[in-house]
């Protein structure tokens, strides 16, 4: 699930709705998210926050840790352009967050970039699963920043990093999902 601190939730939901071209059905706040989970009979929702700017990772993770209770289990986030992102991975683990969410389209990188190898290695060492927005995204419709074949590249170098390939492995790239990642025991 995606939710935001109260002070930015309305603005964030409007921006996401406008970019995607369809309405949102949540206020995007912690309180409304918990209400929806309860009303729908969902025991636990996994919060997947995103630091869209390098300067946001600490504050986003502080908020994620604050709401990491009851029916919300939180992941943390890092931004690969923040020079402290490896230290932030250690902090994510110490905060009790359950994994890491990255969104290459919003964060402006491609999964296959060599500069990310320390990230993958550290996540594997810390046993932090990584959730990735995969395939198409309306924010950058001409570029696919995270494709199933990129996960093969990552696992050749860091075979034991656990990856949750969101959107069934990649929006609008289903054939590549079957070809490249089905059956990999470290990709969910």
Regions found by a protein language model. Give the residues of each.
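Mid-domain alpha/beta scaffold segments of enzyme catalytic cores
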Residues: 1-118, 122, 126, 175, ...
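Catalytic pocket-lining loop regions of alpha/beta-barrel enzymes
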Residues: 98-99, 112-188
